[in-house]
From Swiss-Prot:
GO CC terms of this entry: plasma membrane
Keyword Metal-binding found: no
Membrane topology: Single-pass membrane protein
Name used for this protein in its record: UPF0387 membrane protein YohO
Coiled-coil annotated spans: none
Residues passing through the membrane, by range: 6-26
NCBIfam families for the chain: PRK13681.1
Protein family per UniProt: Belongs to the UPF0387 family.
Length: 35
């Protein structure tokens, strides 16, 4: 599951750079459901 972990890290980095809290929460909840 290393590929998935890298994808999650990439998403978090993009979200952090964007600074969009709503997207971060939505992405985090999606990751929890997908995982």
């Amino acid at each position: 599951m290393r590929v998935a972990k890298i994808g999650v890290i990439a998403l978090f980095l993009l979200m952090a750079i964007g600074g969009i809290g709503g997207v971060m929460l939505a992405g985090y909840s999606f990751i929890l459901r997908a995982g």
